[in-house]
From Swiss-Prot:
Entry keywords, A to Z: Capsid protein, T=3 icosahedral capsid protein, Virion
Coiled coil spans: none
Name assigned to this protein: Major capsid protein
Biased composition (Basic residues): 18-30, 44-61
Subcellular location: Virion
Length: 208
């Protein structure tokens, strides 16, 4: 009796399908390659501005179309030692046409909130005397009544009046004067004294 021994073939037989599967898996693994995605550099994102609910509160000054705030400067020249006169602030301020005949006629109401009165001396060192001045906040006085406040003719000086001192807290009708400053010198008529330089700040409302 003869015995037949069947040896398995590595490249065939039972083990051959397993080898083929492994080889096919390796081939697939080799075929699959990682894909690298290259993206173009994007544009920077625009940041949206936050719109606050109180944007109006950041605005300063008087809203357009409702009012205005202006500053006027005028001078009174060629004053002598015994000069006297007055500034009536309002529609009677003839020394400042830009205010009297200009912007004041464009509004129904106004108030002067600040007055700077400066005396610029042009007197010689040999001159003597002074110029007294007085504030009348209600335009009731027509001539100088007090000699307490003075400018020395040879030195000059300045005086600032705020709103509460010049009746400038409340609004005034554009046809009414607000206040007055009077002055009078005690020097000689032959002596040159100098000039006044006046700066006023005006608020206006209710345009015509």
């Amino acid at each position: 009796m003869s015995t037949v021994v069947v040896k398995g073939n590595v490249n065939g037989g039972v083990q051959q399908p397993r080898m083929r599967r492994r080889q096919s898996l390796r081939r697939r693994a080799n075929r699959v390659q990682p894909v690298v995605m290259v993206t173009a550099p994007g544009q920077p994102r625009r940041r949206r501005r936050r719109r606050g609910g109180n944007r109006r509160s950041r605005r300063t000054g008087v809203p357009r179309g409702r009012g205005s705030s202006e500053t006027f400067v005028f001078t009174k020249d060629n004053l002598v030692g015994n000069t006297q006169g007055s500034f009536t602030f309002g529609p009677s301020l003839s020394d400042c046409p830009a205010f009297k005949d200009g912007i004041l006629k464009a509004y129904h109401e106004y108030k002067i909130t600040s007055i700077l009165l400066q005396f610029v001396s042009e007197a010689s060192s040999t001159s003597s005397g002074s110029i007294a001045y007085e504030l009348d906040p209600h335009c009731k006085v027509s001539s100088l009544q007090s000699y307490v406040n003075k400018f020395q003719i040879t030195k000059g000086g300045a005086k600032t009046y705020q709103a509460r001192m010049i009746n400038g807290v409340e609004w005034h009708d554009s046809s009414e004067d607000q206040c007055r400053i009077l002055w009078k010198g005690n020097g000689k008529s032959s002596d040159s004294a100098g000039s006044f330089r006046v700066t006023i700040k005006v608020a206006l409302q209710n345009p015509k």
